[in-house]
Design a protein with these regions (language model features):
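Bacterial N-terminal signal peptides
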Residues: 9-19
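Edge beta-strand at a domain terminus
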Residues: 146-171
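Bacterial N-terminal signal peptides that target proteins for export
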Residues: 1-10
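A short, polar/proline- and glycine-enriched secondary-structure boundary/capping micro-motif
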Residues: 79-85, 106-114, 151-158
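Tryptophan-anchored aromatic micro-motifs
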Residues: 32-51, 85
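Acidic, glycine-rich flexible loop segments
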Residues: 103-137
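Boundary at the C-terminal end of the N-terminal hydrophobic targeting segment
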Residues: 22, 26-30
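N-terminal glycine/threonine-rich, aromatic-flanked beta-hairpin/loop signature
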Residues: 51-94, 101-105, 137-142, 146
Length: 171
């Protein structure tokens, strides 16, 4: 069976139009997704090492499997890697999270860097959050605790408590 060229061209054009101009808007966050997804949060500490930081922001990815990755707007001061952790449901619209990051120590001098040294390990920090998700699933509030540990894993100065507000990152 032979198809006229005009008919094939029309079919191809119709396909392209529906593909390009169809509903290309990203799907809304599915109902019941809970905390899973990408978030931007502001933290305010009342005590501890972070109490003096007034513009602390965190970016999170809460993975469906219960893991999370966090990075802050201060990860480069001093250089520290992102934090990694876990999260879980704790009731209707309530969640708990716990994540850990490494603390680094500044080199004593520039010569330490040129000799192959650099920012050496100087401990770790653990954040825990008690999160309450808004009814629409697009924002949250949280109570935050920070525990500081020295390089040997013993409690160190700087632990504190505060609050956070977060918003889901969306198109």
């Amino acid at each position: 069976m032979k198809y006229p060229r005009a008919w094939l061209s029309g079919l191809l054009a119709a396909f392209l139009v529906t593909t390009v101009w169809g509903d290309s808007t990203p799907a809304a966050q599915p109902a019941g997704a809970g905390l899973a997804g990408a978030w931007r949060a502001r933290m305010h500490f009342d005590s501890g090492a972070f109490a003096g930081v007034k513009d602390l922001e965190f970016m999170y990815v809460y993975n469906v499997g219960g893991t999370l990755t966090e990075s802050s707007n201060y990860d480069a001061a001093p250089p520290v890697p992102p934090a990694y952790g876990i999260w879980r449901p704790a009731g209707a619209n309530h969640y708990q999270s716990k994540y850990v990051f490494y603390v680094t120590k500044a080199p004593a001098s520039f010569q330490d860097i040129t000799k192959g040294g650099g920012w050496s390990p100087d401990g770790s920090g653990v954040f825990t959050e008690e999160i309450t998700l808004a009814a629409d699933g697009n924002s949250y509030t949280a109570k935050v605790a920070y525990l500081a540990y020295d390089v040997n894993g013993k409690p160190a100065a700087g632990s504190g408590a505060g609050t956070a507000t977060g918003v889901r990152i969306r198109f």
